[in-house]
Structures are given as structure tokens and as C-alpha cells.
A protein has these predicted regions:
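Short phosphate-binding/catalytic loops that engage adenosine nucleotides
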Residues: 31-32, 111, 157, 197
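Phosphate-coordination loops involved in phosphoryl transfer and adenosine-cofactor binding
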Residues: 6-9, 91, 132
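Internal alpha-helical scaffold of NAD(P)-dependent oxidoreductase catalytic cores
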Residues: 43-50, 127-214
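NAD(P)+-binding Rossmann beta1-loop-alpha1 motif at the extreme N-terminus of oxidoreductases
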Residues: 1-56
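C-terminal active-site/capping subdomain that shapes the small-molecule cofactor and substrate pocket
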Residues: 217-222
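Hydrophobic Val/Ile/Leu positions in short beta-strands of Rossmann-like dinucleotide-binding domains
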Residues: 11-12, 71, 137
Length: 222
């Protein structure tokens, strides 16, 4: 009997905002999330309960039998833990979800590896509609590229291949659009609070500004 792609056993290494949203989305699509790792038991258990998986806070206890390992950690933690993450997983596919880290980080540590990058801002408290999230895929082997594209396609209609240089530019552009904008919102909120004005009066302006770039080039909408 031919196995479906959803039968692929998946381990999540990380239980933060992105990992939580992505693991839940794959779980809702029928994927088998077999284990969740996090440094903190509270985070590991919380996500594991949502996707009916085991959990651990010990890297040595991470299952060696999964077919796919999705690593979603802070950049510094990922680089620090890389040797332990990849130990005894030569036959498995390992991917990270970072826009800013090149695929070459895996070289010398894994045989099958890649990048599975959903470009969106995530929080644990708010579920994202993955149908609208663009995924950017890169893998060392062509067959793994196709596997990752197939997995992403179960979640989103917007799946692209992008190399590490392209993804770095995507990540930088996303920082300008999201992080810088949020910082400006915070400054505006502080100013309004100083004069006893509610931030909600800005929401129609924020919404219309965002809607404009769906129809006009950013420079034309200025």
C-alpha cells in the first residue's frame, strides 16, 4: 500500500511562536507529530498536548526514528545545539525555518537537509491562516526539495523555491515591513497615550494604508 505524505513522522525541535503555529497546522492536516522538544517543560508540554505528541526537554531523548525534523529555534540556540540536534539522524531529513540562516549551516552535520521557511509573523495566541502564507523551500537533494514542496502545498497555495541569498533578502524585506512597522505603532501609541487618546483611532488609517499596497506600488501609495 502506498503511504500518503501525511504518514511522515515529524519531530519539532522548538516550541515557540512559529513552531506552535506550524505544528498545529500540520496536525490539522493529518500529519503525525510524534515528538516536541523545548528547553522548557512548560512550552514542550503545551505544544505536545495540542498535537497529541510526546515531548522532551533533553536533546539526548529526541526520537531517532522520525523521517522529518523541523528545527524552529532562535538563531543562536540553533547554531549552538546543531551537533546534538543532528546526532544519529543520517537517514532523516532535517530542516530549519529561519529566513536569515543559510542552508550551508547543515554542512558537515547532516546528509539530508534543507530549509522550510514560512514568511509570516507568528504568535502563540493567534492562529494564522496558512493558505495565505508563502513558503520558501530549499534542500540539498532534488527529491527532498520536492518532498518539502509537497508538504508545504498541503498548507499553502503559495510555495516557492528560494536559495539562501534570496531568502536573506526576503527576511530583510520582512523585517522592514513587519518589525519596523510595529515599532512605529509603538511610538505612535506612546504619543497618543501621553495626550490621553486611544490607539484604536489609528486602526482605520492602519487598515487603509495596508489595503493600498494590495492595489498600488508602495511608492505610489505614499
Amino acid at each position: 500500500m502506498k503511504r500518503s505524505i501525511e504518514d511522515t513522522p515529524v519531530v519539532f525541535i522548538g516550541a515557540g511562536n512559529l513552531a506552535t503555529n506550524l505544528a498545529k497546522a500540520l496536525y490539522y492536516k493529518g500529519f503525525r507529530i510524534v515528538q516536541v522538544y523545548s528547553r522548557t517543560e512548560e512550552s514542550a508540554r503545551a505544544l505536545a498536548e495540542k498535537v497529541e505528541a510526546d515531548y522532551t526537554t533533553d536533546l539526548q531523548e529526541i526520537s531517532k526514528d522520525a523521517k522529518l525534523y523541523i528545527v524552529s529555534l532562535k538563531d543562536a540556540a540553533f547554531v549552538e545545539l546543531l551537533p546534538q540536534i543532528t546526532e544519529d539522524k543520517q537517514k532523516s531529513l532535517l530542516v530549519h525555518t529561519a529566513g536569515s540562516i543559510p542552508m550551508s549551516v547543515w554542512e558537515g552535520h547532516a546528509e539530508r537537509y534543507g530549509v522550510f521557511y514560512p514568511m509570516q509573523t507568528f504568535s502563540k495566541q493567534r492562529e494564522v491562516d496558512f493558505q495565505e502564507v508563502p513558503f520558501f523551500i530549499e534542500a540539498k537533494r532534488a527529491e527532498d526539495t520536492e518532498l518539502l514542496k509537497a508538504i508545504a502545498s498541503t498548507l499553502s497555495e503559495k510555495v516557492y523555491e528560494a536559495d539562501s541569498e534570496q531568502r536573506k533578502s526576503l527576511h530583510l524585506a520582512a523585517v522592514f515591513i513587519c518589525n519596523f512597522t510595529n515599532h512605529m505603532y509603538a511610538l505612535a501609541a506612546d504619543l497618543l497615550e501621553k495626550y490621553n487618546l486611544p490607539f484604536e483611532v489609528m486602526l482605520p488609517l492602519i487598515d487603509e494604508t495596508a489595503r493600498k499596497v494590495h492595489e498600488l506600488a508602495p511608492r505610489d501609495a505614499q
